[in-house]
Amino acid sequence: PQDTSSAASDVYKRQVSNAIYNSDIPVICCCDGFVIGAGFFLPCSSDIVLATKNSYFQMPGINFDVLVGSAHLGRLVPKQKVREMVLTGEKVSVEHIFSYGGISSIHDNKESMMLRANELAKKICSMERDSIKVLKKILNSNEVIDVNRAFKQEQQLTFQNKKNLSD
């Protein structure tokens, strides 16, 4: 039998991720410390990502037979790095993600990161709201992969894999 609490949790994660990604309002994500597993979906679904220097990123799902995350991760790092991260479950430094352009800026502490986030938010809020909405739609439609569809497929394949492993 399928673990319904796990299935419900995965549906919720997908809904949250989709809500962030599909929001009409640009989402700025601030990362401080561990960005692991399901927590990785937040920056991967956001429009702008900031982080402190003590942050690191990890997709350890392979260690638990959870096979999701690659679609979203592709928004922060190139496809070969996605493969390495999801196949090994190893952690990656904030500097590494920054070198690929997945993080806009690295900050010494939370305070300076939040100041930058507020500066960016004020600048975006000063723009014409309807133009921002249209631009968000354009940016999302320019994605090479439909992360919403891919995430759902990853979850379905994970459930099937877990079922096969338990049989």
Predicted regions and their residues:
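Conserved donor-binding/catalytic loop of nucleotide-activated donor transferases
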Residues: 7, 23-25, 45-46
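Single conserved hydrophobic/aromatic residue that forms the stacking wall/gate
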Residues: 1-8, 12
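Terminal peptide-recognition signature
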Residues: 26, 43, 97, 135
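C-terminal long alpha-helix characteristic of the crotonase
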Residues: 50-55, 103-151
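CoA-thioester-processing core
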Residues: 16, 20, 30, 36-86, ...
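Short alpha-helical scaffolding segments that buttress acidic/His motifs in well-ordered protein cores
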Residues: 85-89, 135-139, 154, 158
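Glycine-rich phosphate-binding loop at the start of an alpha helix
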Residues: 10, 14, 37, 67, ...
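Well-ordered beta-strand positions
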Residues: 47-48, 84, 88-90, 96, ...
